[in-house]
């Protein structure tokens, strides 16, 4: 006799893994069904996590008790903090990961969660009675009953892959599509659309001439995504490489347009604007003589490289001929060609802010089936769907993040209220309150909420309280401690900053743009001693304190705007009651 579950999650990608983990950790008996248990949270496209705004999302998932950041740190091969030259609202962590280790670590996580069962199979039908989902049926003829179901099917629903005029059914190279669900949902009034994404060829690193490429190393000091302290610092010892296309490459690519599924009308789905194929780029930006390409390593124990910026669905011979004209790739061999994939999605205006559907009760959607693109966006939706499915079962208030609380709140609000007409990707520009939604304070914004939900254990909540206490002590010291001209002027002159003529509070010095706490501590012994007393994460705590000191005026002003808007929304809401 098969058990009945509280929550069934369909699909083991980034959304599905976070959804299943959240539901089970909140105490719900949960089943995760996936077609291939060796590919949990598979990095189907580039082997990287984070990036502009996306890195903030990963840190928010971590702050709420999800696992994407922890798994990223364990599989990391390179770390970079993007946009360091800009203000802290724009800083975004990004990591290259070992694709195989990433999947393996996710499986370890899932197998250690007590109330989570795993099942390898393909869901072909939802069990729906009187407008409420009651479970699922699988290809093996198994029926699982549940109180709630979360669909996280990614690109697999009626997936079709293209290389030139050749087309193959599938949701990913070598994997079958999921069929039957869209047809069933259409009968219940759901609108179904088609979207397109793509991936580039994978290169054999043994055939790349790296001497002709520009090396791009990770940050000297490294870094991590999770707010937890790890036993070992994440690795940061693999480089990426940069090269460029040129007009001859573009000419070769153009010879394949007559065979391109994009230009022959075979593919009707809309592709991601911010991750266009190489054929899209040379048409849209015909005035550009070159396009930048990044060669990203797939892992520690492989020669495979991902060529970021060269996504294509052109015929294989055209792809290969064009690749061989790129500097450094004259003798390149490939492991497989690039391809486009077209798949079903459901316009997310058919959902509530909890990610529960409006047409079928207790059914939730998360990830690319909502019209988003990216591992990070998918993971965030999965986490929120997992949380809200459990709260629905308990008949407790829904968990909805506001736009001034998290990028996750911006993401879901955009999807539900605006919908999508192309694959949705998060950017810092989408957030009105990005000074509040920084990557450094995701734990301060969200970890207490995760603790209340039961996702963040007490020891982790204690870490947050320690961080806030040490940060506030550091800020108070800087506000009250005075420095004399003889003590600090040698440092100021070296830093190109105006010397003091009389004693000043340390705060006045730290506020100068050319001065940082880490630099000045070497010249102010009591400050250095205070920082050295901070156990473990002192770099993170110093950064948090410095951001608050330097940007306090901007932060306070933005918080006032957010609070004012909330009051207006409350008044409007009451007026409509």
What are these language model-derived features?
Residues 127-143:
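Conserved beta-strand-loop-beta-strand element in the redox core of flavoprotein oxidoreductases
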Residues 2-15:
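Beta1/beta-strand and adjacent pyrophosphate-binding region of the FAD-binding site
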Residues 3-5, 139-148:
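Core beta-strand elements of the Rossmann-like FAD/NAD(P) dinucleotide-binding domain
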Residues 306-372, 400-413, 538-574:
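A glycine-rich dinucleotide-binding beta-alpha-beta segment and adjacent secondary-structure elements
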Residues 378-399:
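Internal hydrophobic alpha-helix adjacent to the cofactor/substrate pocket in enzyme cavities
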Residues 21-125, 140, 152-172, 176, ...:
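Conserved N-terminal/central alpha/beta ligand/cofactor-binding core
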Residues 430, 436, 447-452, 456-574:
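Extended, charge-enriched "interface" segments that sit outside catalytic cores
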Residues 10, 143-154:
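Short hydrophobic core segments
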């Amino acid at each position: 006799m098969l058990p009945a579950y509280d929550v069934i999650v369909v699909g083991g990608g980034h959304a599905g893994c976070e959804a299943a983990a959240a539901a089970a950790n909140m105490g719900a008996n949960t089943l995760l069904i996936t077609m291939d248990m060796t590919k949990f949270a598979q990095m189907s496209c580039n082997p990287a996590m984070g990036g502009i705004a996306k890195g903030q999302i990963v840190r928010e998932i971590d702050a709420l008790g999800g696992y994407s950041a922890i798994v990223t740190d364990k599989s990391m091969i390179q770390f970079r903090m993007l946009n360091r030259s800009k203000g802290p609202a724009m800083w975004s962590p990004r990591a290259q990961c070992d694709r195989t280790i990433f999947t393996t670590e996710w499986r370890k996580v899932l197998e250690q969660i007590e109330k989570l069962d795993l099942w390898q199979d393909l869901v072909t039908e939802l069990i729906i009675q009187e407008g409420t989902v009651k479970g699922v049926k699988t290809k093996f003829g198994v029926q699982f009953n549940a109180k709630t179901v979360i669909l996280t099917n990614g690109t697999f629903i009626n997936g079709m892959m293209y290389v030139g005029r050749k087309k193959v059914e599938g949701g990913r190279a070598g994997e079958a599509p999921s069929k039957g669900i869209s047809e069933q949902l259409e009968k219940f009034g759901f609108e179904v659309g088609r979207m397109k994404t793509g991936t580039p060829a994978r290169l054999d690193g043994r055939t790349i001439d790296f001497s002709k490429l520009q090396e791009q190393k990770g940050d000297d000091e490294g870094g991590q995504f999770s707010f937890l302290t790890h036993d070992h610092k994440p690795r940061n010892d693999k480089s990426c490489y940069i090269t460029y296309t040129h007009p001859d490459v573009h000419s070769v690519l153009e010879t394949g347009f007559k065979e391109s599924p994009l230009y022959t009308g075979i593919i009707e789905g809309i592709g991601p604007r911010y991750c266009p194929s190489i054929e899209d780029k040379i048409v849209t930006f015909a005035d550009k003589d070159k396009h930048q390409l990044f060669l990203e390593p797939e892992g520690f124990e492989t020669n495979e490289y991902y060529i970021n910026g060269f996504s294509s669905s052109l015929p294989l011979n055209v792809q290969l001929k064009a690749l061989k004209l790129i500097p450094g790739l004259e003798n390149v061999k490939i492991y497989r060609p690039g391809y486009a994939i077209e798949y079903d999605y459901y316009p997310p205006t058919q959902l509530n802010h909890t990610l529960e559907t409006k047409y079928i009760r207790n059914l939730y959607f998360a990830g690319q089936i909502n019209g988003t693109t990216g591992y990070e966006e998918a993971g965030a939706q999965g986490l929120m769907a997992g949380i809200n499915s459990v709260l629905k079962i308990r008949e407790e208030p829904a968990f909805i993040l506001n736009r001034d609380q998290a990028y996750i709140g911006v993401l879901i609000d955009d999807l539900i209220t605006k919908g999508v007409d192309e694959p949705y990707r998060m950017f810092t520009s989408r957030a009105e309150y990005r000074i509040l939604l920084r990557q450094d304070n995701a734990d301060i914004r969200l970890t207490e909420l995760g603790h209340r939900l039961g996702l963040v254990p007490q020891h982790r909540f204690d870490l947050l309280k320690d961080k806030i206490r040490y940060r506030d002590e550091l800020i108070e010291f800087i506000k009250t401690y005075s420095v004399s001209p003889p003590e600090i002027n040698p440092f100021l002159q070296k830093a190109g900053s105006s010397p003091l003529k009389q004693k000043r509070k340390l705060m006045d010095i730290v506020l100068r743009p050319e001065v940082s706490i880490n630099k000045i501590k070497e010249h102010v012994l009591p400050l250095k001693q205070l920082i050295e007393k901070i156990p473990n994460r002192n770099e993170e705590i110093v950064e948090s304190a410095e951001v608050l000191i330097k940007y306090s005026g901007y932060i306070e002003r933005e918080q006032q705007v957010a609070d004012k808007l909330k009051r207006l929304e409350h008044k409007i809401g009451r007026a409509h009651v």
